[in-house]
């Protein structure tokens, strides 16, 4: 049986060169999303792209493989994503952030407590 749930998708647009200390910014965001119990997160690596600088970054040339575009995508309930946006703004100031309303549809035995249950006293926390 399919279970449809309203959710929000947060996308953060970065470069492989973006750092927090010695780590990639995408790693820091992914780890924090996991620690915060978000329903799901993925890092996508682009083969080409440009941002506010207008500089094209591409994988077409082997000597230009640094700084390719990355997108960190996080999906969870609207309330939990709203709370996570402040984390993103703190770790990735100046990064482009987009928010979209999505409908998740799960078929089969998979379960995501963060989307299925609002958590204790509606906090959405599941730890």
Language model segments and positions:
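Positively charged, small/polar-rich N-terminal and surface patches that mediate targeting and assembly
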Residues: 1-127
């Amino acid at each position: 049986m399919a279970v449809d749930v309203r959710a929000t998708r947060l996308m953060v647009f970065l470069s492989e060169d973006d750092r927090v200390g010695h780590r990639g910014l995408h790693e820091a965001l992914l780890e924090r999303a996991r620690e915060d119990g978000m329903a799901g997160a993925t890092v996508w690596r682009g083969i080409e792209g440009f941002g506010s600088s207008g500089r094209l970054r591409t994988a077409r040339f082997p000597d230009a493989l640094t700084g390719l575009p990355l997108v960190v995508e996080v999906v969870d309930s609207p309330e939990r994503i709203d709370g996570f946006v402040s984390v993103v703004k703190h770790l990735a100031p100046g990064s482009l952030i987009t928010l979209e309303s999505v409908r998740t549809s799960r078929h089969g035995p998979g379960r995501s407590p963060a989307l299925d249950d609002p958590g204790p006293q509606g906090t959405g926390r599941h730890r």
